[in-house]
Amino acid sequence: PRVNMCRLAAYLGPEIPLRSFLLDFPHSLYQQSWDPKELTEARLNADGYGVAWRQRDGRMGAYAQPMAIWNDVNLPALADALTSTSWLGNVRSATPGQPVHAINTQPFAVDRVAMTHNGYLSGLAQGGRGRILSNLSDVVQSQLNGTTDSEYLFALLRQARLDGAPDLATALAAALRIATQCTAGQAALLNVCVSDGEQLVFSRHAVERPCPSLYLNRSPAG
């Protein structure tokens, strides 16, 4: 079956407005939504978009719309009004059969952690979803709102943190390990970025498929 994929971007550094992160960078996420490069399993990312950012109180905020990014009439005003030192962004190409809805639109954020995922987990409908749920506490299960593989991966990450993972990298590694075990080693693309507003942690991983590209750029402060 055809499985579509999202595009993601992340930023950590001096405070910048949302416009700089989402719209103004060369080949920005906005441009990638309709003019992608190196996109292997979709043509457009028009099924929603979202951003997450570190708020003044240290918690991660999120904004998501289940529409193409270029159709959001609120974006120009938000792009100038919101500023942060940490951003995550995602433009979505929904897997066929997955509802296009705000609750299924990344990034996902709970309290002081946010996550965005480019890729997919196969096998959820073949028992993988139930096996993932069996690894989640009642508290984490109660916070599930949508139906996507990405949100279930985020739930596993939060569970790993509740179970005592000492840092984000350890929690992400645990989430990826359990997710691939629960889906019995079926095909998966697992480019993931996690943020607590003070650090970014990435994975570039795949099962039975080539990894999607993932680029890192470091610039001097300021």
Name each model-derived stretch.
Residues 2-67:
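Extreme N-terminus nucleophile/cap motif
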Residues 2-4, 45-49, 82-84, 89, ...:
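Short, basic and Ser/Thr-rich N-terminal targeting/leader segments
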Residues 6, 51, 105-121, 177-222:
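Conserved catalytic micro-motifs used in adenylation/nucleotidyl-transfer and phosphoryl/amide-
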Residues 19-20, 61-62, 97-99, 124-126, ...:
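Short helix/loop capping segments that flank catalytic or ligand/cofactor-binding pockets
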Residues 33-36, 66-78, 89-111, 135-138:
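Short acidic (Asp/Glu) patches
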Residues 48-85, 89-91, 204-208:
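Structured interaction and signal-relay segments at domain junctions
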Residues 72-75, 134, 211-218:
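A short, polar/proline- and glycine-enriched secondary-structure boundary/capping micro-motif
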Residues 122-196:
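Short histidine
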